[in-house]
């Protein structure tokens, strides 16, 4: 629900389109299903005029406990383009877990551990699983 539509449709699948796909996901029985990443919350609000929290809640309601919902977060930048204060990170993580997110995969493009600490702390505090990632490239 995240990468395919992000790569192929510029994160512009409407809630109605997602709703048509949802009945198939519980049957698939995935351990986890990534629903948010990079630009999803921003694009949902900016281009579709939809509520990303409602989207997360509807997906969670449809999938239930069959699959954990996951998100890819940019550490201190969360899903935005600038670093946020701990108060913003706290509220965002609290609402994400409350709305059905089970796992947040967290990275910093510069692999600066200080930029992921707050997000890890709050995800765990609210009962989610913090899944940290490291960025790397293979130089030709």
Predicted regions located by residue number:
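Acidic, glycine/proline-rich low-complexity segments that act as flexible tails and inter-domain linkers
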Residues: 2-11
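Terminal or standalone catalytic/regulatory effector modules within metabolic enzymes
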Residues: 20, 24-44
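Anaerobic metallocofactor- and corrinoid-dependent redox/one-carbon enzyme cores
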Residues: 15-19
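Active-site beta->alpha loop and helix N-cap motifs at the rims of alpha/beta catalytic domains
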Residues: 37-140
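Conserved, mostly hydrophobic/aromatic
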Residues: 4, 25, 106
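Ordered, soluble secondary-structure elements with a strong preference for glycine-centered loop motifs
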Residues: 11-12, 83
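A common structural microfeature
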Residues: 6, 30-32, 66-70
């Amino acid at each position: 629900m995240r990468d395919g539509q992000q790569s192929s449709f510029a994160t512009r699948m409407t809630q109605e389109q997602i709703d048509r796909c949802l009945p198939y996901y519980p049957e698939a029985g995935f351990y986890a299903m990534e629903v948010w990443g990079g630009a999803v919350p921003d694009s949902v609000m900016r281009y579709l005029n939809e509520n990303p929290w409602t989207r997360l809640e509807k997906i969670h309601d449809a999938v239930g406990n069959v699959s954990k919902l996951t998100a890819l977060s940019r550490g201190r930048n969360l899903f935005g383009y600038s670093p946020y204060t701990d108060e913003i990170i706290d509220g965002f993580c609290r609402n994400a877990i409350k709305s059905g997110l089970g796992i947040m995969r967290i990275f910093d493009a510069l692999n600066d551990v200080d930029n992921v600490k707050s997000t890890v702390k709050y995800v765990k505090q609210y009962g989610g699983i913090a899944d940290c990632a490291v960025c790397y490239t293979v130089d030709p």
